[in-house]
């Protein structure tokens, strides 16, 4: 999630020192005029709608129809069953193909705002914790107050370990026992505000991102006193932002908890960083068994040096030690996590020949023939590591990066790409073979309705790249195809691979656009094969809701629903996905899942895996029908045979079918 929109930021800037969702003036939501990777360099993209335009009533979150579809662009499908579903919080209409909704676990009471009226005293109380006084609140439209207060209790990302699910929240963390997926139970609710609360887990350690200025070292809920009122800007003058006053007890960075006692996590370290931690990536170095590494992506404002020595938000030409244009690397000794510390601050955007820190301001490796001015890349939003390949993919505001992480403390940029259809490079996922990477664009920052009928299907979409000789080669875009309403925040967000052998399939969150399962085996023709969606939370108000993350873990799809709670799903067979393929995916059992630390999937030698490949060979017509029939007959005979040698031989056949299978 990135900047909501500029007008909301300007309204809140004078009063609330909130998270980076509102504080990043540098994240313009307009496309670059550089040429598209999929078009000749002479082509110029259309102009995106102006996210800075305020409504007459001063409410930037009031539903507003999309402007006319730009010439040559394709919008979203209004004939899709997901369009115009009945609104509601817990009784919204639903539409699904290939997905069965099993259960919704509502948020624990402590993690709910408990108010839908901006005049509710609970709203003012929450905003007060962010440092807003009565004078500040008088300047902020009521709908903005409500949306801001809702954000303070938003569910965020997830991590998994054994039979435990760790569900982050801007207000802390909830830990569930999922040993019985049909009846998960809440083990621990840990109140610890500071947002976003994104988690990772490794052995007995839990890591949590914190970036908001109400975060405290002691996990306290009292926040900090509001700063003194600022002078009212002159007519036409932009409000000037300054970081909140230094506080010795403020925490912005990565918390580390010992979860040896899962019901009673103990904070053992709190590593401060200049911009806080919007997200982080756990790096497990196969050559270093004694340490793990954390890549910290900070996207918020730079704090004052009086609060953390060495912090500077100056431009690189004014201060070469600026906290902009870098990430931080934390080294965590597993035997003594209390000694965790920042060991490097890699300049991923630097030109190694000239030493210029902001070298990617004018783009990456393609589109050099046209005028360029992509989003300035002074931060990464998310970095996905694939340690088995020694690679990482960085989604870094104005660019997508390919990184060499063989030396995890010193990642090196291998390639960088930009795209005029992308507003904000948000996250990334590798294919299992490491030959493709799928990036996402969070156009509108997560609080924008960006799947309306006239919103182009190349904006706020996925972009699939092939990796060839350590370079990123563009394939095509994918966007959840169904049109959504004006009150539904919708854009590409977090997802994970589903371990279907022979295919690259990902389940992905689209906020109130629901979840979409995309097959990107063919990088040039990604296609949706399953989905689930609910109607909008409210018919006439654009509020933060929907899926932050949807991840596959050990046979189920788990959805972090921002406003409602935790959803659990299972796949069902369709013409695009057979029961054998689903069963083959269920043979993969992970002991741990941190999606930004991607693991190589390996399938056991089981006959159901061979059955899945045969189904794919039949679907793609790669083998004649009589050959398909004979293979199936051989498997069926072996399953009912006592001939162990024949059965073992057929099991060995399963992986050998991989090269022939296709979709």
Predicted regions, residues:
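Bacterial N-terminal signal peptides
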Residues: 10-23
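Hydrophobic single-pass membrane-insertion segments
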Residues: 25-27
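Soluble extracellular-acting proteins and domains
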Residues: 581-663
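Feature marking well-ordered beta-strand scaffolds used for ligand recognition
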Residues: 29-613
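N-terminal secretory signal peptides that target proteins for export/translocation
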Residues: 1-9
């Amino acid at each position: 999630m990135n900047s909501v929109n500029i007008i909301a930021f300007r309204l809140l800037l004078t009063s609330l020192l909130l998270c980076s969702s509102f504080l990043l003036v540098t994240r313009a939501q307009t496309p670059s005029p550089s040429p598209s990777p999929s078009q000749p360099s002479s082509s110029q993209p259309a102009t995106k709608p102006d996210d800075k335009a305020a409504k007459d009533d001063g409410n930037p979150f009031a539903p507003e129809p999309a402007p006319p579809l730009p010439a040559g662009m394709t919008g979203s499908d209004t004939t899709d069953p997901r369009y115009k579903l009945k609104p509601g919080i817990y009784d919204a209409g639903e539409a699904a193909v290939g997905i069965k909704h099993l259960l919704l676990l509502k948020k624990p009471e402590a993690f709910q705002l408990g108010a839908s009226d901006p005049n509710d005293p609970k709203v003012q109380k929450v905003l007060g914790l962010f440092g807003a006084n009565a004078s500040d609140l008088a300047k902020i439209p009521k709908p903005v107050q409500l949306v801001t207060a809702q954000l303070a209790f938003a569910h965020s990302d997830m991590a998994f370990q054994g039979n435990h699910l760790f569900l982050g929240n801007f207000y802390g963390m909830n830990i569930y026992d999922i040993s019985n997926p049909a009846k998960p139970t809440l083990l621990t609710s840990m109140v610890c505000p500071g947002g976003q609360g994104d988690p990772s887990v490794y052995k007995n350690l839990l890591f949590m991102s914190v970036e908001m200025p109400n975060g405290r070292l002691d996990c306290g809920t009292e926040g900090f006193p509001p700063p003194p009122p600022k002078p009212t800007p002159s007519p036409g003058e932009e409000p000037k932002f300054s970081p909140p006053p230094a506080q010795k007890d403020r925490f912005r960075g990565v918390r580390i908890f010992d979860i040896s006692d899962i019901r009673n996590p103990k904070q053992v370290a709190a590593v401060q960083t200049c911009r806080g931690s919007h997200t982080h990536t756990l790096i497990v170095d196969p050559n270093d068994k004694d340490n793990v590494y954390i890549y910290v992506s900070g996207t918020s404002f730079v704090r004052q040096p009086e609060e953390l020595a060495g912090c500077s938000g100056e431009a690189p030409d004014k201060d070469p030690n600026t906290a902009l244009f870098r990430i931080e690397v934390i080294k965590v000794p597993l035997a003594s996590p209390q000694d965790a510390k920042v060991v490097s601050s890699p300049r991923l955007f630097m030109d190694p020949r000239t030493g210029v820190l902001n070298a990617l301001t004018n783009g990456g490796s393609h589109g050099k023939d046209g005028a360029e001015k992509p989003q300035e890349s002074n931060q990464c939003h998310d970095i996905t590591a694939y340690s088995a390949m020694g690679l990482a993919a960085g989604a870094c505001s104005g660019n997508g990066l390919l990184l060499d992480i063989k030396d995890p403390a010193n990642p090196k940029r291998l390639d960088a790409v930009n795209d005029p259809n992308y507003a904000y490079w948000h996250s990334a996922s590798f294919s299992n073979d490491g030959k493709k990477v799928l990036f996402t664009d969070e156009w509108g920052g997560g609080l924008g309705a960006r799947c309306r009928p006239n919103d182009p299907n190349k904006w706020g979409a996925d972009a699939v790249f092939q990796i060839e000789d350590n370079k990123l080669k563009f394939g095509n875009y994918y966007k959840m195809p169904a049109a959504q309403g004006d009150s539904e925040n919708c854009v590409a967000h977090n997802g994970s691979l589903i371990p279907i052998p022979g295919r690259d399939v990902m389940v992905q969150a689209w906020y109130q656009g629901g979840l979409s399962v995309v097959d990107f085996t063919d990088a040039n023709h990604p296609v949706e094969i399953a989905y689930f969606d609910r109607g909008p939370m409210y018919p006439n108000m654009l509020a933060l809701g929907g899926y932050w993350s949807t991840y596959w873990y050990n046979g189920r799809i788990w959805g972090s629903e921002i406003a409602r709670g935790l959803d659990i799903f299972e796949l069902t067979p369709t013409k695009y996905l057979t029961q054998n393929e689903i069963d083959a995916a269920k043979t993969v059992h992970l002991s741990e899942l941190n999606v930004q630390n991607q693991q190589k999937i390996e399938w056991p030698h089981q006959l159901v895996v061979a059955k899945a490949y045969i189904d794919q060979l039949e679907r793609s017509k790669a083998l004649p029908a009589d050959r398909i029939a004979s293979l199936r007959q051989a498997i069926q005979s072996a399953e009912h045979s006592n001939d162990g040698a024949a059965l073992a031989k057929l099991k060995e056949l399963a992986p050998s079918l991989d090269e022939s299978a296709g979709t």
